[in-house]
C-alpha cells in the first residue's frame, strides 16, 4: 500500500500502513495519532477514498474537525468514512515522515537532550511499539529514536553542515538555513545513522559522533543506494527536491509508475 498525506491550513495528515498521524506544521508538533491502521475496516475504507470525489467544502469541514485533535476523533473519522479523498485533493504524495507520531520536545538544551538519551539502555520500547521492529542488536533503538524525536532542540542551532541526518527511519535530511526537510527511504537512513554513530551512547555535545554529510556526499549515497531501495519516499518541498535530486523527482512523484 502506498502512503499518502494531505496538507492544508498548516495541518498535515499522514496515512500509511502503520497508522494515521496529524501534524501541526505551523507549531512543528504532532497533534494526534492512531496506530494499527492496517485493520480490515481501514483497508476497506481506504480503497473507497481513492474513487470518491471530495469537494473543498468537505475538506474544510474535515480540517475543522481535526483542529481539536485526539485519537478517538481520528478513529471516528475512519469508522464514518469521512477521511478526504487523496487524489481528489491532487495531493497524492508518497510520504513516510514519522515526525507526525512523536511527542513535543521537552528538552531545552543539547546537554539535557544528551542526558535524556543516555538514560536509556537500548532496550527501551517506545509506547507505540514501532521502534523495536526496525532495529537489530547493533542499533540502539531508543537512543536513536529519541535523538530524532527531539531534533528541534539542536537543528536550529546548526549552521555549517548542508545536511544533517536526524531520522533513523526515513533519513530526514535538513537544510538548516532554509528549515526544509527531505525524507528518504529507511534503508538509506539506517546506513547513514550506522556510519555516523559508532558508539553505544550518543552525546550531542560531541558533534563528531553524529554523521554530517555534504551535498556531494549525499548525492553519491543516493546514487549508490538507488538500485536497492524498495520503498520510495519523497519531500513535498519541490524546490529542494528539484535542485538536489532531479533524477529522483519524477520517480518519487509517481510519474514513472514506481510502487
Model-identified regions with their sequence ranges:
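Alpha-helical structural context detector biased toward long hydrophobic helices
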Residues: 1-2, 6-259
Amino acid at each position: 500500500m502506498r502512503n499518502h498525506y494531505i496538507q492544508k491550513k498548516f495541518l498535515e495528515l499522514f496515512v500509511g500502513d502503520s497508522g494515521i498521524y496529524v501534524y501541526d506544521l505551523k507549531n512543528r508538533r504532532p497533534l494526534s495519532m492512531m496506530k494499527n491502521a492496517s485493520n480490515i475496516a481501514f483497508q476497506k475504507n481506504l480503497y473507497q477514498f481513492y474513487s470518491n470525489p471530495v469537494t473543498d467544502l468537505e475538506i474544510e469541514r474535515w480540517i475543522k474537525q481535526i483542529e481539536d485533535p485526539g485519537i478517538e476523533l481520528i478513529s471516528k473519522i475512519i469508522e464514518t468514512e469521512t477521511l478526504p479523498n487523496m487524489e481528489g485533493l491532487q495531493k497524492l504524495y508518497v510520504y513516510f515522515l514519522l515526525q507526525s507520531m512523536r511527542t513535543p520536545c521537552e528538552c531545552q538544551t543539547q546537554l539535557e537532550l544528551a542526558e535524556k538519551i543516555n538514560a536509556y539502555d537500548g532496550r527501551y520500547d517506545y509506547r507505540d511499539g514501532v521502534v523495536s521492529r526496525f532495529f537489530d542488536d547493533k542499533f540502539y533503538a531508543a537512543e536513536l529514536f529519541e535523538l530524532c524525536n527531539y531534533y528541534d532542540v539542536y537543528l536550529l542551532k546548526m549552521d555549517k553542515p548542508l545536511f544533517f541526518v536526524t531520522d533513523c527511519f526515513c533519513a530526514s535530511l535538513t537544510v538548516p538555513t532554509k528549515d526544509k526537510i527531505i525524507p528518504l527511504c529507511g534503508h538509506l537512513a539506517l546506513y547513514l545513522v550506522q556510519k555516523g554513530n559508532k558508539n553505544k551512547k550518543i552525546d550531542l555535545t560531541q558533534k563528531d559522533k553524529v554523521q554530517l554529510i555534504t551535498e556531494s556526499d549525499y548525492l553519491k549515497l543516493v546514487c549508490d543506494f538507488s538500485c536497492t531501495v524498495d520503498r520510495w519516499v519523497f519531500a513535498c518541498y519541490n524546490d529542494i527536491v528539484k535542485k538536489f535530486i532531479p533524477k529522483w523527482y519524477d520517480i518519487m512523484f509517481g510519474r514513472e509508475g514506481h510502487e
